[in-house]
């Protein structure tokens, strides 16, 4: 068997947007991914589901998997002919032991590549509003490890650092803070020299402390600063508040529970993240196509009988057209059939399969879709309703009351799931979660089913529409309703939620 390949990929300090294009490309091709604690969950989610994931869990002062063992894991997996990605927080060669990991690969003639990563020494400062250099304050940057090798002692040339008058950055130095600050003071640095700590830099739970060399240690104790944290010393730290941008985002640090199915949550999660929020993905439902769907089979066999097809979700569109394709059919069989969609996102999904919706109501719900179709359907035209197995009867009732012929074909079941419910329950009980988003009545039902005996009074639900709000009201949840039944409108409601409009 031919040898495999190993890539040391810098994952950056946490924000998934900071991994390089090359790093993401290699990660998408991985057979095996070896990663540790400093790699954020957002980047771990980028690992292909087909790849073997090996968590070596290295933490400050606690290395459950020794470095020598990690080196051998990389070697063994590559000798199996696999493409191995060693995913490392920050940059592999900035105190990342990347050189140590390459030595064994080099000795065994294993092909390798190193992809640089954005180091926290610069990125965490940037997200804290601190420029690493500024011509009015300094012209050099010095990155120092604040963590001694196992069995060794730190030996930092404080006098030389002090004389350079540059920005000093200590990585992994939170446990050595007293030694570092006293070392600088004893070397003659003024106690009022600006200094800062950025904890969890570039992440939604980032915290920042700006003080002086003389006060940083005490204030860090008071704030209970924890790893990962970087320490910066220099006049540039005085610019932190002036240049702060990340922590001034409108939803910065706000934990928001997202209950959509995994395959549908991406847009909402990404938009929340861009606003500084910390979205917590907790899919409460999963969409499962109905197997051996006889009703769908007969509908597709007689598809030309229908003057209109009504599609009520993105999932329904995907399942319907996947089924058509599986039978050797495509959109051409719908040449004489009009299509109605329940909302803008459903219409967009239809456009992605090459078709344009003939009708989408201004108010995005089944009732208004049916009312619009009742006005448009021709005499003796038959309507095909494609929706979920458990769905509102609004469309059926309105078509029936207007004497419109129809067939209803359920395309999928909506199952409740509760993965990681204990973690979410703890966050709710401890008051860490403030808001929860519901994009359908079924997400409300699924959430409630997984939260038995958990007090929910501290949560405010943001509902995509009135039907969803009715479900929230049924369980006495505090809620607000988006002005329009869209993700963007839900986000607008989150941005204004402090102003009220909360119905008990």
UniProtKB/Swiss-Prot annotation:
Record region (Uroporphyrinogen-III C-methyltransferase): 1-248
Matching InterPro entries: 4pyrrol_Mease, 4pyrrol_Methylase_sf, 4pyrrol_syn_uPrphyn_synt_sf, 4pyrrol_synth_uPrphyn_synth, 4pyrrole_Mease_sub1, 4pyrrole_Mease_sub2, CobA/CysG_C, Siro_Cobalamin_biosynth
Catalyzed chemical reaction(s): uroporphyrinogen III + 2 S-adenosyl-L-methionine = precorrin-2 + 2 S-adenosyl-L-homocysteine + H(+); hydroxymethylbilane = uroporphyrinogen III + H2O
Annotated keywords: Lyase, Methyltransferase, Multifunctional enzyme, Porphyrin biosynthesis, S-adenosyl-L-methionine, Transferase
E.C. number: 2.1.1.107, 4.2.1.75
Pathway assignment: Cofactor biosynthesis; adenosylcobalamin biosynthesis; precorrin-2 from uroporphyrinogen III: step 1/1; Porphyrin-containing compound metabolism; siroheme biosynthesis; precorrin-2 from uroporphyrinogen III: step 1/1
Gene Ontology molecular function: uroporphyrin-III C-methyltransferase activity; uroporphyrinogen-III synthase activity
Residue ranges, annotated region (Uroporphyrinogen-III synthase): 249-504
Organism domain of life: Bacteria
GO biological process entries: cobalamin biosynthetic process; methylation; siroheme biosynthetic process
Family, as annotated: In the N-terminal section; belongs to the precorrin methyltransferase family. In the C-terminal section; belongs to the uroporphyrinogen-III synthase family.
UniProt function note: May catalyze sequential reactions to synthesize uroporphyrinogen III from hydroxymethylbilane (HMB) and then precorrin-2, which are intermediate compounds in both vitamin B12 and siroheme biosyntheses.
Protein name, as recorded: Porphyrin biosynthesis protein HemD
Source organism: Ruminiclostridium josui (Clostridium josui)
